[in-house]
């Protein structure tokens, strides 16, 4: 950090800044927000997030990355990404996998990640189903990293550890007939010895989802705020947003101050980078609407109009077309409705359909 005085901005300025930073103007086919990957939850939704920015999934690889969730990343990045996501120390490693089912095993810290990554490498030498890999890896790691599953009548490795260690095991995450298939990445790399590049990830979060607090960045990484203190970047400016403070790279201050009004209408899938910000009350102040959008299971996508989330949407395939149902939080203007027709067609094309049917509720 430096001595630059704190600046005060409005919520609207922050949202305009994020919309501009994340490439919703479709000015580039390689949006910078790919530095954070694009979460592919539910499966197949990440290409919709990319299309909202004028990009495609060409040249991208699907891996388990942040918090063990499936993300699309540039195919050239897995080795560097693995080094950046490798826990900073034992305490950080324990925080990332701490769960009731492996309370003692989590205390192994970095060793838990290393032994699991090595088990992945010995197991995944060809495409295998996730269940088959889980069985083999579970048998190869210390018992303290597994738990008894009564319905299965077997011990399973903690899912939180399993998916976070997959990238370190140089594993690609695919799908075949609706089932997860794991296979070796095309360009294998060694298990990281130490973390490297974590500070760049922190800076990327602050650039695309800032201003943000240390706690918000830590939550995105799946760890505790104290863990990332050693990699908290220099060159940040404190920003007060309607009284709440966060941090932004000094290089982005002018972009924040001069962020233009956003006019685009976009359909964002549930895992869209814009929705990954941990300050949900800033994105959507109404608590009831927050609950409607960010559901633990089966949540809808978000309708972005300008810089505001104005509703939710869902899509389902019906023959050779896709039916897109939009539910506005309030009445949608005629211009937004017209734009939604185009965006619904974009969703249909991404999903391989020829036609879109838009319903607005």
Language-model features: where?
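Glycine-rich, small/acidic residue-mixed loop/short-helix segments
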Residues: 287, 292-361
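Loop-centered beta-sheet repeat module
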Residues: 151-230
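Short, leucine-enriched amphipathic alpha-helices that occur as contiguous helical runs
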Residues: 113-117, 130, 134, 158, ...
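Anionic-ligand-binding alpha/beta catalytic cores of soluble enzymes and soluble regulatory domains
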Residues: 210-256
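A short acidic, leucine-rich amphipathic alpha-helix
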Residues: 132-138, 214-218, 307
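Non-catalytic regulatory appendages
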Residues: 236-288
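Phosphate-backbone binding and catalysis cores of DNA-processing enzymes
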Residues: 1-147
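A short, conserved structural fragment
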Residues: 58-65, 167-175, 236-241, 311
């Amino acid at each position: 950090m430096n001595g630059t005085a704190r600046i005060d901005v409005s919520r609207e300025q922050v949202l305009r800044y994020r919309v501009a930073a994340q490439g919703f103007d479709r000015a580039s086919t390689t949006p910078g927000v790919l530095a954070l990957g694009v979460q592919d939850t539910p499966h197949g939704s990440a290409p919709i997030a990319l299309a909202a920015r004028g990009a495609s999934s060409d040249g991208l690889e699907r891996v388990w990355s942040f918090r063990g969730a499936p993300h699309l990343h540039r195919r050239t990045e897995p080795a560097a990404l693995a080094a950046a996501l490798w826990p900073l120390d034992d305490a950080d490693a324990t925080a990332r996998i701490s769960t009731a089912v492996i309370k003692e095993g989590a205390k192994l810290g970095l060793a838990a990640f290393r032994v699991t990554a090595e088990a992945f490498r010995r197991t995944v030498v060809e495409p295998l189903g996730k269940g088959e890999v889980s069985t083999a890896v579970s048998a190869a790691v210390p018992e303290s990293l597994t738990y008894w599953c009564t319905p299965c009548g077997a011990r399973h490795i903690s899912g939180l550890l399993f998916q976070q260690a997959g990238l370190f095991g140089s594993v690609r995450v695919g799908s075949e007939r609706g089932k997860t298939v794991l296979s070796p990445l095309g360009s294998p790399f060694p298990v990281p010895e130490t973390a490297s590049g974590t500070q760049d990830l922190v800076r990327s979060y602050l650039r695309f989802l800032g201003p943000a607090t240390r706690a918000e960045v830590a939550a995105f990484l799946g760890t505790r705020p104290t863990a990332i203190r050693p990699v908290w970047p220099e060159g940040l400016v404190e920003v007060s947003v309607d009284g709440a403070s966060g941090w932004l790279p000094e290089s982005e201050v002018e972009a924040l101050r001069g962020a233009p009004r956003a006019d685009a209408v976009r359909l964002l899938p549930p895992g869209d980078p814009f929705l990954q910000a941990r300050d949900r009350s800033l994105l959507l102040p109404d608590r009831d609407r927050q609950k409607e959008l960010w559901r633990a299971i089966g949540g809808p996508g978000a309708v972005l109009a300008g810089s505001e989330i104005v509703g939710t949407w869902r899509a389902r395939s019906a023959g050779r077309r896709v039916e897109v149902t939009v539910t506005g939080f309030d009445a949608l203007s005629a211009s937004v409705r017209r734009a939604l027709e185009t965006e619904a067609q974009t969703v249909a094309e991404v999903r391989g359909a020829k036609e879109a049917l838009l319903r607005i509720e």
